[in-house]
Structures are given as C-alpha cells and as structure tokens.
Amino acid sequence: MSKRNTMPDYDPVPSQRGGASKPPKKKKKKGSGLFGRIVRRFFLVLFTVIALILVAACLALNLIFNGPSPAARDVLTMSLLEPSGTKWIPGLFMDAETLDSIRTREDSNLTDEFSNTSEIVINKDAAISTGTDEWANSPDGIRFESHSGDTYNAHIMIVRDPSKVYLGTSTENFSTSIPGTRIDDQIETDGAIAGVNAGAFFDNGTSDPSVGSVPEGLVYSKGACKWTTGSPPNGIKGFAGFNKDNILVVAQDNLSKAQAEELNIRDGCCFGPVLIMNGEINQEAYNSNSGWNPRTAVGQRKDGAVVFVCIDGRQAGSMGGTYKDVIDIMIEYGVVNACNMDGGSSSIMVYRDTYGLFGEAGTVQVINSYSLLQERPRKMPTFWMVAP
C-alpha cells in the first residue's frame, strides 16, 4: 500500500489563486534610530550636568552663608545684595534678621553731617600735584585714566570745570508708567559730552532692567527739585550734589528738600555711603566687607576738578571693587569729598569722543565694560552729565 503524500502543494504565485500578496517590508534607514538615541542621551546628560551644577552651587552657597567664616559670608552677601539681579539670593539662605544686621553694619565714623564747602577753592587752571599743565592734551577739559587692582579694572574721568557737571534726568516728570532712558541715548538728547550713572532708582517692583522709571530719594536737576519720594535700597544712606557755587556737597544721610534748599543744591541725588568727607576717610566703609562689585563714585579735588570713578562690570579679569578700592583711587587723585553712587549693572561711563581718543571722532564711546549679560546699558532715571 503506497504512502499518501500529506505535504501541501507549493504554489509559487499565490495571487493566481485569488489570495492577496503581502507588501514588502520597508527597510529602516541605517542611522536614523541611532541619531535619535544620541540626541536624547545628549539632552539627558546636559540636563543632569546642569542639575548637578545647581545642586553643587546651592550647597556651596549654603556652606558660605551658614559656615564657620562670618567674613566670607559678609563679603558674599554684600557682593550679591548690590546688583539688582542677584539681591534676592542671600534671602534664600539666611533669615531676615541676620541679613539686616550685615547690610546695616556700615555705620560711619565721620562726625560731620555735611561736607565743609570752604575746603574747596575752585581753580580750573591748577595741576593735580606738579607744575605741569595736566590739561595740555585735553582741550575739552576732560581727562581719562585707568587703574587696575587684583580684582578690578577702573576708569577715571576728571572734569576740569565743575560748573559743567549737572544731573541729567530721563524725563521732566518721573512716573512708574514712563521707563527710564539709556545713558547713550540720554547723552544725545542732552547734547552732553560725557556722563556716568547716578542715583538709586525703582524698577516697578521688578528686576527688569528695561524699566528704571523713577528715582529713590531726593533729586535736584539744574536748580529745580524733581523728586522727593523714597530712599536708596538695602538701608543705604547718603547724598551727593553740587551747590550753586559748583562745590560738591556730600551728606551722610538722605537729604530732605528743606535741607537741600538751605545748602543751595542745584544738582544732586541720593546714594551712599559717603567715602571721604573733608579729606577724612570713612573708616567704617574702608574696612567693611563691602563685597566685590561694579561701582561708580563721584568726588571733588580741592581745586574744584570733579573725579568720577567707574569700575568694570563682572567679566574675565574684573570681579569688581570694594569701597576700599574706590577710596584708595580717590585719595590717589587728590579728592577731599567723595560719595558712592549706584553700582552693579548700572555702572557705566560714556564720552562723546570729540578728538578720536577712543575711536571715531564725534561718536559716543562707552569707556568701561559693563556686565557680560547686558547687550546695552540699562535704563535709568538719573545721570551725571558734563555739558560742552
């Protein structure tokens, strides 16, 4: 008996029996899946690295703020409190009482309330220390010099005639609905030949550098009182202004309008602390842990020449300067009265380059280097300006 073949017949063409053919499988492109995995892993690693850096930074900050060294804590606290973009950080690691005790520690040893105007005898033809004419190469009456320290680069602007220095304002009528202006725009509006940032200002309760709308504290401009409300932040007290005899008056406290009228103030604003008064150094400021920050200060020599100091913003080669650094520079340049102005991301010095000292003649040049995080100078309501 023969065995029956149970294997199915082979049909090489299934479609001929009415069955549907299966579509051929698409081949995956080599590398497409690999690229996706690489991208995902890259961002995963990047996110992990950023998270680890943030955690490490928080641990390091906590160690400094709450560690065994009060001096390191105070320096870091003051370095972070002054710039508007970082002043919120110390509050994350310290209670309000400790924070207040650090920032209000700088009580002055100076005994006078105001500087003595009789100390200044204006002599626009005097030299700083020798018989040579220091203005021989400065036909517009403005000299620039630079000074470097271990942690900072500073720019010094000396103005021969104090009567040309005035307080410029971003508007005739300050309002939180009117943003401030940038100093390079303000110098064009005023037709001035030089300028630096001036006093404290309010940013509508934000840290947005685009606002800079209204000042904090008394403001006088060209003989008129422009603002009387508020006071500088972080417990800062002080006033700097020129009277109608073109003498710089520095005060240890924020002036009232009545006091300013009595002192015949023509241009001035609130900020501090006073660094030098009547030739005497403010030792509390000099020896304080004021932190490394970009800084601006205004001072006057005995002959009436006005000295502005502007320390670069934070970047490679310049962490910033302390009050001590600024005082040392002012003393070196013969200043007898000086006051600290707003600093941090506000610190800036500009000059209409009349003779092409820094670039193309006639253009407005930014003399200092402000923060790397800023594309342009921030908006502000007040500026020290130099008229032509």
Model-derived segments and their meaning:
Residues 193-197, 239-241, 248-249, 299, ...:
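Structural recognition of the beta-strand scaffold that forms the well-ordered cores
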Residues 152, 162-164, 243-247, 300-307:
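Beta-strand-turn-beta hairpins that frame and shape the catalytic cleft
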Residues 156-160, 241, 299, 385:
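Short, well-ordered beta-strand micro-motif
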Residues 209-230, 282-337, 346-388:
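Conserved, well-ordered active-site substructure
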Residues 163-164, 200-204, 255-257, 304, ...:
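Solvent-exposed loop/turn segments at secondary-structure junctions
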Residues 151-156, 236-237, 292-297, 381:
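Short glycine-rich loop/turn motifs
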